[in-house]
Structure formats: structure tokens, C-alpha cells
Amino acid sequence: MAARQADLAITYQPQVHFFADEGLPLVRVGTLINSPLNTVIALDKQIKTPADLQGKKVGYSVSGIEQATLATMAQHAGIDPASIKLVNVNFQLTSALLAGQVDAVIGGYRNIEAQELKLQGKTPVVMNVEDYGVPAYDELVIVAHRDAIHEAKIRKFLTALQAGVGYLRAHPQKSWEAFAAAHPELRTELNHQAWLQTVPLFATDPAALDKARYETYEQFLYNNKLVKKVTPLTNYAVQLH
């Protein structure tokens, strides 16, 4: 994207903040999923809230942001983040949890890993990060090069995306059948459940920008020393209405 080899790209809102901190000319122009998907998941029924993670082992895959997220949840619950033992499970979140290697995991998505565990007959305890002190953010966003954000084709894309999302939300099962027919190798019960869980999370107005949400999350990253400075919102996010 920075080299103008594509017009648009899909990424995560936290990554947009990191790009801005590095001085890359990438700007958020639209949103696909306007809710966090990240969760803390446990199978132990004694774990109901982050407060119950004191003295427990929590598996993670991505250092930095997941550690800051878990620490924030712990502080929100009134426990010392240092009382939680973090274990790197190398993206094997579900298997580590099922094998009892950890008491809980962070980084599992509410629309994927939580559904996978249910399909295996488990009853996971799912804690959404934004319910425990972590600022809400957009999970999936669309970025463009700063020099291209006012090109007409980007506005046209966002208009078409809004229409597509409207159809998707109005016809979740019908759209799933069309997708599965086009990609039969992906017709699994997990993908079906993930599809149905994800559809309500698509942004109904992809171009809309919640400025306060982005500024709050930027401050969260700065407070946790994940970015070197607080970058002005206009440097990395716009609303093209």
C-alpha cells in the first residue's frame, strides 16, 4: 500500500495506529467490522470474570497488544496483572485450552474460537475485551494511500460496500449459501456458524468514522508504550462522506 501497488487494503484498526506511528502514508477510509472480536476465553466454570484469572495461566499468541489488553482487563477487575502467568501458545489457542495447558486464552475471536469450542461440545466462558476497561475499536478497516483518499473510485467502492453489507445483513443465510456454493471447500459447520455470528458485526455505514473511538484507542496504545507518540487523528483516519 505504501508503495501504491494496490488501491485499498484490509487491516486492523490497531495496525493503523502502528502505521501512523511509523510515519507510513496509510489512512483508514472505511470500516468492515466495527466491533472488537478479541476475547478472553476459559473453560473452567470457576473463571467468570477477569478477576478470576488471578494466579492462572493465560495463553496468548501476539506479544505487546494482547499483554496490554489483558493487563488493562486485570486492572479493571482490581487484580495485579503480574499475578497472571502468560504462556505463549504459538497460535494454538483452542488446542492449548482443550489440553489444559492453560486456564484461559486471550486473542481468540468471539466469532471463531468461541464457536469452535461450542461445536466440540464445550461451554466456553467468553469475556469481550471492551466490557472490561479496554477501549472499543474497529476490528477490520480499509486503508488507502494518503495521496489517493480523495479519488472518486474510493467513494464509489464505499458506496458499493454499504449496499453489499445491507444485503448481507438482510439475507445472512442466503448469502452464506451463495458463498459456500462458490467455495465448497469452505462449507463447514464452523464456517457457517462463524458467518452467522459475524454478519451482525459488519458496519452498516462503512465510511462513518467515530473520531472519539480512534483518539481514545490511540491514547490507550500510548499509555501502554505501544506507540512512541500520540499522532493526530487526521494523519491516519478520514470520513469521506
Specify the residue positions occupied by each region the protein language model found.
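Short, glycine-/small- and polar/acidic-enriched structural segments
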Residues: M1-D80, K85-N90, T94-A99, D103-N111, ...
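Class I S-adenosyl-L-methionine
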Residues: A20, A71-Q75, K118, A180, ...
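Short, hydrophobic secondary-structure boundary micro-motifs
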Residues: R28, W176-A178, K229-T231
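Short helix-capping segments at alpha-helix termini
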Residues: H76-P81, Q120-K122, A152, E185-L186, ...
